[in-house]
Amino acid sequence: MASNATDYIKHHLTFWNSDPSAGFWSLHVDTFSISLVLGFLFAAVFAMVARRASIEAPGRLQLFVEMIVELVQTQVREVFHGKSKMIAPLALTIFCWVFLMNFMDLFPVDLFPMAAQWIGYTFFGLEPHHVYFRVVPSADVNATFAMSLSVLILIVGFSIKAKGLGGWGKELLTAPFHSSNPVGAIILAPLNFAFQLVELAAKPISLSLRLFGNLYAGELIFILIALLPWGLQWVLGAPWAIFHILIITLQAFVFMMLTIVYLSLAVEAH
């Protein structure tokens, strides 16, 4: 156990690092494993519902899944103006996966870290204080940035597919500032290219930091509440948990919607 509040907070904000000496190339095992489990959980539940779907007597889980699918499909139809069969499944995956990652923040702060400490000490003889386990993948900037980089790759890929490699390259040099004069176009090309690079870089950065910042702040507040006397934990923790349900849902929805918007803009000509 932590000897004081500072150690307690530091311990709960430290990731399970695969190899601290590896620096940039080290892996946050807890983030990776929890994300993988949640991804499999989402896929398994939706696959099970699809196999057991019934028109005559749909169950509650089927109705709930259909409601989510309809919500996502409606947003895609309203926002994405191109033609692609993968946008709706992609948006559904993003929304559900990010929501499940965010939802991990609602579990008791000490539940998983203490379980990891017990397993580490009992089966591997590890010192409990040196066993770390964070269960909110979206509170890890590495995870949110990895997802946003994947979105950036999709943006570039969709843009090239819609406009061709030459058309995409031309757009990098001729938008947002145009000139019918060849000399003016040459002068504006470096400026346009710089603007396009800034725009491309801003999208993944804003996506990742928005999600990370909200979930990191939420996790930190839960940790601070856990330091209070037991009675106050319930008085403050319950209202914050209820409010946090709105936050985790909203952040998953925002991440999904911005991805759809960015992909829609990518296939439209300037």
Curated annotation (Swiss-Prot):
GO biological process, one term: proton motive force-driven plasma membrane ATP synthesis
GO molecular function, one term: proton-transporting ATP synthase activity, rotational mechanism
Membrane-protein topology: Multi-pass membrane protein
GO CC terms of this entry: plasma membrane; proton-transporting ATP synthase complex
InterPro entries (UniProt xref): ATP_syn_F0_a_bact/chloroplast, ATP_synth_F0_asu, ATP_synth_F0_asu_AS, F0_ATP_A_sf
Its job: Key component of the proton channel; it plays a direct role in the translocation of protons across the membrane.
Name of this protein: ATP synthase subunit a
Source organism of the structure: Chromobacterium violaceum (strain ATCC 12472 / DSM 30191 / JCM 1249 / CCUG 213 / NBRC 12614 / NCIMB 9131 / NCTC 9757 / MK)
